[in-house]
């Protein structure tokens, strides 16, 4: 019986604590097969009773004072007890310094590989059991963007010696700061032009992201303008004294500013260049390249078009810079007259550039027009050289319309896209300006939207609406248009009213010449007050005497009868309408000025 009991208790010493493992090898591994039961009982009895000398325990007693582990815990191995040290000569790179694999993939033409590279960035290794705080720490460290490169914004007075600064007046310091701002702006412009060539044009040409013809169309002759601005910078540098001051700059500007006419071709091509660039951005390779450049420090968080538009924005700053220099120049200074001449020169240059750009923009949109019917073609459209206004409005049915107001005709279109080419489909018949009638509609006069449910709903009525139509209702055409807000409505009113004013003032009835103006006290004796008054009289008469006929009536079969009825109503309502307008004008009340 005793040998069987000893055999059953044989694996128990294995489950003892580590303190018990310090015994002899024989005690730790258990007795051998030839060990007798009496020897085992004696040894175990002495070990168990060594901690308690006041009694002699039996063979079934266990005083290890340790919890008993379950049988399934015997096979559990703790990683903390293993020696996992790396070799001392192994190179280990910290995880935070490992670059994303997607960033290491160079731009390729294969779309599948490119999508793979984009997908890698969204992977998350869930086997990492770090705490959320540590994970957030690593992610924030790896996603910190590279800081953008900033330019020095130091003023001229900050770089001046203290003793020199005390010897100059406040006005002279401000004059020198204005001159320094002009020279510093020229330096920044030169750097941006070189950067556009080096960081955008040349890499895209080398990587075949765009063809040479496309790049020439987008960038233009950007390189030819770098020597132009370097020449001005050199002249200002030669005129600068050792102490950093510039005595005279007027003669330099008078001789240099006319050379800015070289920008006429570049500015005229900007609209077409912007359209081509937007079209090429649909190419994933182009978009990926531009996005990489945008995230680089050299771009200063500016996209490619911002660099291409810098010359135009620089041109419009020259008058402001010259006026600032003139403002702080003493009247007895020889630069006064020269600066005034320079301001006139730059204004003339900008006027010529704007005229050329307007003609190019006008022709660009004319080429984008598509006609559904040959009757829509009008020779006044092809002969247009000036585009007065253009933009998006909504029709009465809620559809988006794009309106072009040329100097002689107004064209309503619908934007369409065919084969990735944007164009404008002419909608209805174009309206010549001399036949155009503009009507102001108050908020809520017309319900917008063509749905059946909207006709019976109590929804908010339309705002910022007006109506345009033919003066002769025989073409059976009228358009109720809605602007986005009051500001855009006012802009459209001013533009359309200025276009139709010469025709309305010439054809105004003689009996309406005595109609007083609503705000005569605001006009005074201004030279253009009479012309403006005549325009407002004609437009006011048109808004007062016209009867609002629903535009759907023009499309029905009885259009001629409706026109005759409207004419009869006009004859009966003309005199009362004029009388009411005259009474309100003479009352002197706080009445808002009518837009039309």
UniProtKB/Swiss-Prot annotation:
Induction: By TGFB1. Up-regulated by DNA damaging agents like H(2)O(2) or ionizing radiation (IR).
Keyword set includes Nucleus: yes
Disordered, as annotated region: 1-44, 127-146, 562-596
GO cellular component assignments: cytosol; nucleus
InterPro entries registered for this protein in UniProt: DBL_dom_sf (IPR035899), DH_dom (IPR000219), Endocytic_GEF_Adapter (IPR051480), GDS_CDC24_CS (IPR001331), Net1_PH (IPR037853), PH-like_dom_sf (IPR011993), PH_domain (IPR001849), SOS1_NGEF_PH (IPR055251)
Location of this chain's protein in the cell: Cytoplasm; Nucleus
Annotated spans, Necessary for nuclear localization: 1-74
Known tissue expression: Widely expressed.
Residues recorded with modification N-acetylmethionine: 1
SMART domains: PH (SM00233), RhoGEF (SM00325)
Keyword annotations: Acetylation, Cytoplasm, Guanine-nucleotide releasing factor, Nucleus, Phosphoprotein, Proto-oncogene
DH domain: residues covered: 174-356
Amino acid composition bias (Polar residues), ranges on this chain: 22-38, 133-145
Superkingdom assignment: Eukaryota
A GO term for molecular function: guanyl-nucleotide exchange factor activity
Coiled-coil region: none
Annotated motif Nuclear localization signal, positions: 12-19, 66-72
GO biological process, any: regulation of cell growth
Annotated positions of the Phosphoserine modification: 21, 32, 100, 106, 122, 508
Pfam family, one: RhoGEF
Domain PH: 386-501
Subunit comment: Interacts with RHOA in its GTP- and GDP-bound states, and with CDC42 in its GTP-bound state. Interacts with the PDZ 1 domain of BAIAP1.
PANTHER family, sorted: NEUROEPITHELIAL CELL-TRANSFORMING GENE 1 PROTEIN, RHO GUANINE NUCLEOTIDE EXCHANGE FACTOR AT 64C, ISOFORM A
Function: Acts as a guanine nucleotide exchange factor (GEF) for RhoA GTPase. May be involved in activation of the SAPK/JNK pathway Stimulates genotoxic stress-induced RHOB activity in breast cancer cells leading to their cell death.
Protein name: Neuroepithelial cell-transforming gene 1 protein
Organism: Homo sapiens (Human)
């Amino acid at each position: 019986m005793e040998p069987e009991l000893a055999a059953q208790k044989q694996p128990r010493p294995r489950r003892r604590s580590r303190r018990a493992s310090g015994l002899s090898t024989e005690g730790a591994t258990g007795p051998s097969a030839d060990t007798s039961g009496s020897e085992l009982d004696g040894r175990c009895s002495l070990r168990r009773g060594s901690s308690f000398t006041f009694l002699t325990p039996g063979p079934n007693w266990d005083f290890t004072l340790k919890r008993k582990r379950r049988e399934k815990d015997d096979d559990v191995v703790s990683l903390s007890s293993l020696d996992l040290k790396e070799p001392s000569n192994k190179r280990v790179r910290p995880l935070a310094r490992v670059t994303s694999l997607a960033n290491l993939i160079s731009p390729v033409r294969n779309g599948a590989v490119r999508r793979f590279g984009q997908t890698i960035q969204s992977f998350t290794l869930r086997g990492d059991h770090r705490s959320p705080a540590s994970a957030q720490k690593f992610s924030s460290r790896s996603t910190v963007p590279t800081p953008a490169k900033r330019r020095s914004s130091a003023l001229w007075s900050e770089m001046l010696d203290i003793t020199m600064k005390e010897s100059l007046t406040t006005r002279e310091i401000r004059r020198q700061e204005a001159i320094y701002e002009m020279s510093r702006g020229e330096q920044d412009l030169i750097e941006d032009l070189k950067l556009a060539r080096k960081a955008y044009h040349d890499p895209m040409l080398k990587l075949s992201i765009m063809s040479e013809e496309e790049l020439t169309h987008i960038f233009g002759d950007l390189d030819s303008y770098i020597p132009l601005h370097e020449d001005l910078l050199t002249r200002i540098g030669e005129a600068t004294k050792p102490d950093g001051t510039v005595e005279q700059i007027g003669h330099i500007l008078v001789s240099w500013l006319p050379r800015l006419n070289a920008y006429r071709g570049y500015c005229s091509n900007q609209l077409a260049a912007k359209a081509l660039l937007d079209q090429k951005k649909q190419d994933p390779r182009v978009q990926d390249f531009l996005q990489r450049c945008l995230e680089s420090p050299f771009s200063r968080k500016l996209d490619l078009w911002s660099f291409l538009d810098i010359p135009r924005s620089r041109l419009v700053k020259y008058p402001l810079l010259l006026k600032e220099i003139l403002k702080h120049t003493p009247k007895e200074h020889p630069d006064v007259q020269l600066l005034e001449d320079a301001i006139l020169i730059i204004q003339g240059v900008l006027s010529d550039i704007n005229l050329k750009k307007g003609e190019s923009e006008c022709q660009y949109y004319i080429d984008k027009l598509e006609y559904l019917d040959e009757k829509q073609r009008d020779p006044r459209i092809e002969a247009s050289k000036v585009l007065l206004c253009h933009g998006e409005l909504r029709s009465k049915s809620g559809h988006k319309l794009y309106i072009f107001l040329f100097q002689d005709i107004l064209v309503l279109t619908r934007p369409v896209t065919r084969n990735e080419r944007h164009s404008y489909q002419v909608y209805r018949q174009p309206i010549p300006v001399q036949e155009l009638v503009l009507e102001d509609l108050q908020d809520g006069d017309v319900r917008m939207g063509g749905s059946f449910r909207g006709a019976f709903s109590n929804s908010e009525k339309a705002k910022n609406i007006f109506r345009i139509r033919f003066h002769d209702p025989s073409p059976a055409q009228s358009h109720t248009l809605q602007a986005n807000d009051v500001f855009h409505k006012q802009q459209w009113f001013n533009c359309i009213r200025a276009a139709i004013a010469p025709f309305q003032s010439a054809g105004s009835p003689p009996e309406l010449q005595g109609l007083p103006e609503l705000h005569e006290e605001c006009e005074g004796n201004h030279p253009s007050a009479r012309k403006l008054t005549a325009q407002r009289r004609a437009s006011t008469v048109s808004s007062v005497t016209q009867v609002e006929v629903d535009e759907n009536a023009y499309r029905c079969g009885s259009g001629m009868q409706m026109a005759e009825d409207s004419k009869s109503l006009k004859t009966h309502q003309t005199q009362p309408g004029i009388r009411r307008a005259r009474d309100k004008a003479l009352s002197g009340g706080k009445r808002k000025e009518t837009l039309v």
